[in-house]
Amino acid sequence: MASVTFDHVTKKFGDVIAVNDLSIHIEDKEFLVLVGPSGCGKSTALRCLAGLEEVTEGRILIGDQVVNDVAPKDRDIAMVFQSYALYPHMSVFDNMAFGLKLRKTPKDEIKRRVDEAAKILNIEHLLDRKPRQLSGGQRQRVAVGRAIVRHPKVFLFDEPLSNLDAKLRVETRASLSRLHQQLGTTFIYVTHDQVEAMTMASRIAVIKDGILQQIDTPQHLYDYPDNIFVAGFIGSPSMNFFNAHLRADDGKLYVDLGNFRVQVSEGHPEAYRAYVNKPVIFGIRPEDIHDPDFAPPGIEAQPVEGMVDVTELMGNEVFVYVQSGEHTFIARVDPRTRFKMGSKGLFSFNMKNMHLFDKDTEKAIR
């Protein structure tokens, strides 16, 4: 097993910078997820680690070894792609064993490793089948099994769940989390899906335009985003953002949004004071906007009037799309709510969980 380090890694394709001065240290046995929109450079970073792309600048280390000039086959890593890439004419057993056979591993050792991986993945009963006889989820497990039998130092996953339906993605996420615990190996996982990142990662690295925006635990990333991009990318529905001004009145601070204002929580950061009478971006998550009749006790609620545009019943909650003057926002409320399309109502903003961002830099004010 091994740690992985990106040390000021840059990757260029001509004049295009795909990865820009990336520095991340991934601990041994960690489950790190690289997340970001399509084209942000996350898969390129993974391919550089795998040796499928040459690094333009910087170093990549696996353990204490710099691997920039090490051939992919000698890096002791295993990669699982979005495409399962199974040999259609081979059985599941032979697909899983193929890499070991190329390395001239003894037959009894091959059987032991394949049987061990099949047991972990619960595909023992599929070893004699051909890929065409398998479901999408089963094929994905075979592809993972082919990686497991190699006993690599590091597992790389490049959007492995993209071809699965929604129900199967949920099941496979849980399976991969269990697999990580069982194997105790370093996992590095690339996805554009923030739900996958939040549910599986021990840490998440958010990337935009080839630049690392923030790296932290899922909960801390969610609660304390460093900038507007991270705040909007992590969470579903995403955070509501409003153009606003910070005002001071009788010793208290208010977020002034034109047609309404809300009082800032008493325990606000001292840094807010420097932004009085300046334009800011006010952010609040949908789950921090409540129907007052069903708001949790003890929250620091500020009432805001709005017109209900659309409601979406999700079963255990309702997404309410609201128009308030020139502002629109989404509230994530109790399913017992009486809000209906076209109705007016009051919404409680839990200001204890508000966020403020610098309008020019888009960085969080703390």
Each language-model region and where it sits:
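ABC ATPase nucleotide-binding domain
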Residues: 5, 25, 61, 346-348
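The feature captures the beta-strand-to-loop junction immediately N-terminal to the Walker
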Residues: 35-37
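ABC ATPase nucleotide-binding domains
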Residues: 70-229, 233
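Glycine/charge-rich catalytic "coupling/switch" loops of P-loop NTPases
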Residues: 252-308, 338-366
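ATP-binding/catalytic-site motifs of ATP-hydrolyzing domains
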Residues: 59-61, 65, 211
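Helix-to-loop junction immediately C-terminal to a conserved catalytic motif
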Residues: 50
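Pre-Walker A (P-loop) beta-loop-beta motif of ABC nucleotide-binding domains
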Residues: 22-33
